[in-house]
Amino acid sequence: MAFGQRNTSRGGRGGGGSSFRGRGGSRGGPRGRGGLRGGRGRGRGRPVFDSARLAQQKEEGEESNSESEESSQDEAMESEEESSDDDDAEPAPAVKSYAALMQSFTADSAPQAKRRKLNVDKEEKQDEEADLMDQDANDADHVEEAEEGPETATDGLLEEEDEEDNSDPFEAHFANPDDNILSRRLKHLENGQWAIQKSILAKIGRAITSVPGDDEAKQTKSSIINSPEELKLKQKLAGVMKKQCPTFDTLEKSISPLIFGYQDLLFCERNTSNAESLRRLTCLHAVNHVFKTRDRVIKNNSRLAREDNSDDLELRDQGFTRPKVLMLLPTRESCVRMVDMITSLCEPDQQENRKRFNDSYVDKEEKYSTDKPEDFRELFAGNDDDMFRLGLKFTRKTVKYFSQFYNSDIIFASPLGLRMAIGNEDAKKVDHDFLSSIEMVIVDQADALLMQNWEHVEFIFDHLNLQPKEAHGCDFSRVRSWYLDNNAKYFRQTIALAGFNTPELNTMFYNQSKNWAGKVKVSSNYPGAIQELGLKVKQTFSRLDSQSFASDPDSRFEYFTSAIIPTLTRRSKDSAGTLLFIPSYLDFVRVRNYFSTSATTRTLSFGSISEYTTPKEVARARSHFYSGRHTILLYTERAHHFRRYQIRGVKKVIMYGLPDNPIFYKEIVGGYLSRSVREGDLEPGDGSVRVVFSKWDVMKLERIAGTERVGKMIKEKGDTFDFL
């Protein structure tokens, strides 16, 4: 049974029930891990990774001991002119009426015809229950708690009487939206009509605002908010913010109107410097939203209790289920940071189950020294397990950890952990009703989630705001009409924070952001990583001709074998110290097999390091490469992401494709070659870099070559570009 599913005998579970090993990247490389526990769990054994390209691995002779996994899916990508800017027509949503919803509950509850059950069925059921109990025993996030009604256990959260303010974005967006504006924008959403405006945010970057309509985006201007005092906060939160953060910095002034105005936001400039500010803003907004939602329910409960003719009152103030905020995070440590920020803002008198939370999530051991990059230490410090889910429940004076999902206000989870909680679609028991009333999704460090399994993120978004299969004690007379009309997805706010934009993030923002308040994408103008290497080296960028995104892997391989390999084989002795960087694991397998079996490369000795290579094999490959026994070393992007190896003996770098993260380009080209110069293995100015790219790499190329250069490099007739 999935975590949070109704169960009168055992309460909610956390995690179990699903047996899939979900992995795979939509861009041709595995993006994460699967398995029942699946987590990288540094310090708990060697890293475990899975592959996403089963079919191609079999064709290319992948090792017999590799685990079987799901095939990656081809991803439709926008052209270079529109990949980072515009939104096109979107499909019209289906509307399910209130009557149809109630009919579905009636149908589900109707008596079913009796069937004879064979003994084998009973044995299978007993085996399944035994498996679930075993999973629960090993599950640190397992919860046994009876499910409460969605809005009945209010627990006296209301502390102060805040008057309803029509200028409050909470009122304007959720509680009392303008019917004329709302109906008009919903119609535009059904027709896929967006008005788009481009602007500049001072000292931040470019902003692309999209609002449902024809020309409304041009009329909408986000004002600057200078301090928390200008926000519509609950009194307690306002008092805390006045002490902790009396004024906003430049970033907070610019994006707080977007966040607190309930617009969707794709912010592509997250880094270690602004991470704390972004965390504070998003947590403040989430807690403020939860408090206002719960207080409205409590106030209306009191009103109904006082009124003699309460049946005549129509107070629609809630959703189908209680959870209102979902936070998707990469590791348990990132969850700890979010939780600590929330508790510092709401200052609860008591924290129930905090010790259990500390035992399961907090790891204070210093695992990495300062020789590791700052972004690496931020992501992998502490407990870096990526298999978790946690419910958080607020009462007037208490925060409760490990609350059952249906009793929670905020759900924290990794994509893998939440998908395991929902269950596999092929399994008998699948539960995603607890996601039916999510009104805010916060995806932090989205670029790190790309290095896990992005398909899990897509799966979760596909199951948000669906009408529930069970009533879960819901009082439908209190449910907001736009929930009953299946329009909840148009009210949900999505906030995605990433270090850079990618086709996956763009696609998610295009397909899943249907907010009637509009959406904003913020990115920067890039000077180019080629200018930030710290040494002088010739960098040659070669553009290959690729007719389609789907055929790009084949075109790239053909270009590599016909244009790059001959330069290596003609002077095999001069090829010593060549690092071949390959972003995609699928391409890595294909190239490795080519080196192993092709007669063309018989004069080239090589080693390889991927995300699946054991530590012992990594040490051997690095040693042979540095000693010269192997002239070429194949190296994947995800291996670098998870380990950041300091590879010695690099004299030349060939990039089969560009990395998503521009920091990787600086570390591999600038860092590795600079080290070789310092250690006397390479004369200054003798190193070289060869980069292969296609028009489908426009986002990566912009970050590495620079915003001003990318257009010419994609469109010019010449296909070779040299930089020093």
Swiss-Prot record:
A Pfam family assignment: Utp25_C
Gene3D superfamilies, per database record: P-loop containing nucleotide triphosphate hydrolases
Acidic residues bias locations: 60-90, 126-150, 157-168
GO cellular component, one term: small-subunit processome
Subunit description: Component of the ribosomal small subunit (SSU) processome composed of at least 40 protein subunits and snoRNA U3.
Protein name in the entry: U3 small nucleolar RNA-associated protein 25
Principal subcellular localization: nucleus
Single biological process term from Gene Ontology: maturation of SSU-rRNA from tricistronic rRNA transcript (SSU-rRNA, 5.8S rRNA, LSU-rRNA)
Domain of life: Eukaryota
Organism (species): Sclerotinia sclerotiorum (strain ATCC 18683 / 1980 / Ss-1)
Any one GO molecular function term: U3 snoRNA binding
Places the protein is found: Nucleus, Nucleolus
Alphabetized InterPro entries for the sequence: P-loop_NTPase (IPR027417), UTP25 (IPR010678), UTP25_C (IPR053939), UTP25_NTPase-like (IPR053940)
Function of the molecule: DEAD-box RNA helicase-like protein required for pre-18S rRNA processing, specifically at sites A0, A1, and A2.
Alphabetized PANTHER family for the sequence: ORF PROTEIN-RELATED (PTHR12933), U3 SMALL NUCLEOLAR RNA-ASSOCIATED PROTEIN 25 HOMOLOG (PTHR12933:SF0)
Keywords, ordered alphabetically: Nucleus, Ribonucleoprotein, Ribosome biogenesis, rRNA processing
Family: Belongs to the UTP25 family.
Region (Disordered): 1-176
Biased composition (Gly residues): 11-38
